[in-house]
Amino acid sequence: MINTKALRQEQIAKAQQVICYDDFSPPKLIAGADVGFERQGAITRAAIAVLSYPALELVEYQIARIETTLPYIPGLLSFREYPALMAAWQLLKYKPDLVMVDGHGIAHPRRLGVASHFGLLANVPTIGVAKRRLCGESELLGEQPGSCQPLLDKEEQIGWVWRSKKRCNPLYISTGHRISLDSALLWVERCMKGYRLPETTRWADGIASNRPFFEQMIQKNP
C-alpha cells in the first residue's frame, strides 16, 4: 500500500531545498523534458531534447522507457514521473545548462512539482512550463501575446500566467530549481519561435510522441 502521507511529507521537506534565485551561468545548451505513458500507463516514457542557444537547434535527444513505479495520484505526479526523467538524463552525452520541464515547478500545493523535484535530483536549473493550472489564482489575462499576470497562492507568488500565442490558452511558468521567477519567464520568452510552447518542450513533446514533423527534422539533424 502506498503511504501517500509520507510522500506528501517528503514533498514538503524537499521543497525547503529548492533554490528560488538565479544560480547558473548564461546557458549554451537548453533542454526540454516531457513525460508520457504507454501500455495503459504500465510504461513511463521520458524524452529530453537538448538545443543549442541562441540558435535553438537540436544537439541531442534521448528517450527512456521504464516500468511505471506509482499509479496516478493527484498532487504526487512527480514521484510517478521523475524515475523516467532521471533515466533519460543519465543517457545524455551533452548535459544542458538549463532544463524546461513540461509540468509545474513551485506552482504546486506543496511547492514541489516535477520540475522542482527533477531539478533537485539532477542538481540542474529547471523551469516548470505547464499547460494547465494546478493551484493558485490570477487576474484576468489579456488576449494579446505576451500578456502576463502573477500566479498567486495565499498572497504568495508561485508563478506566471503567460499568453505565448494569440487565441491559445496561456502557459503557467514557475521556478523549478536554481532560477528566479523573473528569469524563468525571461528564458521561456527567449526560447519561443511563434508557437504556443517554447522550442525546448515543443521538441521534447514532438520526439516523445513520434510526431512526423519532428521525425523529419531528426533525419535532417542526425
UniProtKB/Swiss-Prot annotation:
Chief place where the protein resides: cytoplasm
Cellular location(s): Cytoplasm
Cofactor field: Mg(2+)
Entry EC number(s): 3.1.21.7
GO cellular component: a single term: cytoplasm
Reactions listed under catalytic activity: Endonucleolytic cleavage at apurinic or apyrimidinic sites to products with a 5'-phosphate
Residues annotated as transmembrane: none
Enzyme type, top EC level: hydrolase
Residues involved in Mg(2+) binding: 34, 102
Keyword line: Cytoplasm, DNA damage, DNA repair, Endonuclease, Hydrolase, Magnesium, Metal-binding, Nuclease
Site (Interaction with target DNA): 72
GO biological process: DNA repair
Pfam families per record: Endonuclease_5
Keyword hit for RNA-binding: no
GO terms assigned for molecular function: deoxyribonuclease V activity; magnesium ion binding; RNA endonuclease activity, producing 5'-phosphomonoesters; single-stranded RNA binding
Function: DNA repair enzyme involved in the repair of deaminated bases. Selectively cleaves double-stranded DNA at the second phosphodiester bond 3' to a deoxyinosine leaving behind the intact lesion on the nicked DNA.
PANTHER family, per database record: ENDONUCLEASE V
Similarity comment: Belongs to the endonuclease V family.
HAMAP family: Endonuclease_5
Protein name: Endonuclease V
Gene from which the chain derives: nfi
